[in-house]
Amino acid sequence: MPELQERIRNFLKESKRVFLVTRKPGWEEYKKAAKITGLGIILIGLIGMLIRIMGILVLGG
């Protein structure tokens, strides 16, 4: 049991250190991340659509 408490204590100590180093992203950084994420979703959707169309053409829908 003391080992578990020590592991929890170490985890909390390391977590606190990480939170002290991190910062909240600014509006520009947030917009950039949102644009990149949106483009990634669109790209994956287009690839899936192309694979589906090719499957319909090859296998005869």
Swiss-Prot record:
It holds the Pfam family SecE. One of its GO terms (cellular component) is plasma membrane. Its main location: membrane. The keyword ATP-binding does not apply. Signal peptide: none annotated. SUPFAM superfamilies: Preprotein translocase SecE subunit (SSF103456). HAMAP family: SecE. Component of the Sec protein translocase complex. Heterotrimer consisting of SecY (alpha), SecG (beta) and SecE (gamma) subunits. The heterotrimers can form oligomers, although 1 heterotrimer is thought to be able to translocate proteins. Interacts with the ribosome. May interact with SecDF, and other proteins may be involved. Belongs to the SecE/SEC61-gamma family. This is Protein translocase subunit SecE. It comes from Pyrococcus abyssi (strain GE5 / Orsay).
